[in-house]
A protein has these predicted regions:
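Beta-strand-rich interaction surfaces with strong enrichment in secreted/lumenal proteins
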Residues: 95-96, 118-119, 291-294
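Alpha-helical membrane-targeting segments
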Residues: 113-124, 261
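Non-catalytic C-terminal interaction regions
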Residues: 159, 164-165, 178-182, 187
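Solvent-exposed coil/turn segments that connect beta secondary-structure elements
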Residues: 88, 100-102, 109-111, 135, ...
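Short, surface-exposed beta-strand-loop junctions and turns on beta-sheet-rich folds
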Residues: 79-80, 112-114, 157-158, 177, ...
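Short linear S-[DN]-x-LW-Φ motif typified by the pepsin-like aspartic protease active-site region
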Residues: 4-6, 15-107, 123-143, 148-162, ...
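Short, surface-exposed interaction patches in beta-rich subdomains
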Residues: 49, 171-174, 179-182, 190-317
Length: 317
């Protein structure tokens, strides 16, 4: 029996082209393990891939919830909602896409809690791009920990954006048409441009730049700064210690409401404003009103500005 086995082994060695070198099974196993590791290292390698494509008809909501990945939503030709993925580095797991009850969801199947926590301090994720048909309106819920979020020229009913340290940008190229935009970030910045509807932006230490002709602009900050401009019908600004500047290119039609603890707040009104009724108060801060009296002109636009120790300025644009 042993002679037969030796003969078979000799035939194998001869077929392998190395009759004088015996086969080392340990080497074969090691080679297989190395090949497996090498293949695993290519998972998530850089490069854009389409991971999902769904007909837009019937979809009511797109929900993207990731950790350190960047999220971009933009309009495109066609009738499908297309999800693209680009890995930021080797070994990054590709997110999964599911469809349930008219909601398209993009997330990782088994998020790593440890990685999620430390992703606040580092950027190792990839990039998810959602391409939606032009004129297609739905609700969008976008959230990430340290990734940036971008929105380009899309039609939406409502969009809710949340990030911890990432920046949020509603790009000004064509703006977005939305009934409601809600942006929340802690230390990241928020830039919202060329949009209408109701706009709500809340940051803790991040800076805000808002330039839009909104139905209502509600801007909230703790220690970050606010720069806002446009022809919004209603402005509501709330700040603890972060300074705020509001440049009204067109006189609001409803109201201006400013509440501050110690922040300096500057509101500039257009020179052709027909009038207003102002209630400006500060416990220890300075008040500057270039228009003179608290009642100006014939229009009764209500302006309320209140602070404890900050400086309040009402000037002409």
């Amino acid at each position: 029996m042993q002679e037969a086995l030796n003969a078979d082994a000799a035939e194998v060695e001869a077929d392998a082209g190395c009759p004088n070198e015996p086969i080392d099974l340990d080497d074969v196993v090691r080679d297989a393990e190395d090949a497996a590791k090498q293949a695993e290292s290519f998972k998530g390698a850089p490069g854009v891939v389409v991971i999902s494509r769904y007909p837009a008809a019937g979809l009511r909501e797109v929900n993207v919830s990731l950790d350190s990945d960047d999220i971009t939503v933009k309009s495109a030709d066609g009738t499908d909602v297309v999800i693209e993925w680009e890995a930021g580095c080797e070994g990054v797991e590709q997110p999964t896409v599911t469809l349930e009850e008219h909601t398209l969801s993009v997330r990782r199947a088994n998020p790593d809690v440890f990685k999620t926590f430390f992703s606040v301090f580092q950027k190792e994720g990839g990039k998810v791009t959602v391409r939606v048909p032009r004129g297609y309106a739905a609700d969008y819920v976008l959230s990430t920990t340290s990734g940036d979020i971008r929105l380009y020229a899309i039609d939406v009913d409502k969009v809710k954006v949340n990030t911890t340290s990432g920046d949020v940008r509603v790009e000004p190229d064509a703006g977005i048409r939305a009934k409601e935009i809600d942006v929340t970030t802690i230390s990241g910045g928020a830039t919202v441009s060329a949009c209408a509807g109701d706009v709500v932006v809340s940051t803790v230490s991040g800076k805000q730049f808002v330039s839009c002709d909104a139905n209502r602009a509600d801007l909230n900050v703790v220690s970050g700064k606010i720069h806002a401009e446009g022809a919004s019908e209603e402005w509501e600004i709330s700040s603890v210690s972060g300074d705020a500047e509001v440049l009204c290119t067109v006189a609001p039609t409803r109201k201006i409401q400013i509440n501050s603890m110690s922040a300096n707040v500057h509101v500039a009104l257009p020179g052709d404003i027909r009038g207003f009724v102002a209630d400006i108060s500060s416990m220890s801060g300075k008040i500057v009103n270039e228009f003179g009296p608290n009642r100006y002109g014939t229009c009764a636009l209500p302006i309320h500005m209140d602070t404890m120790s900050g400086k309040l300025m009402l000037t002409r644009l």
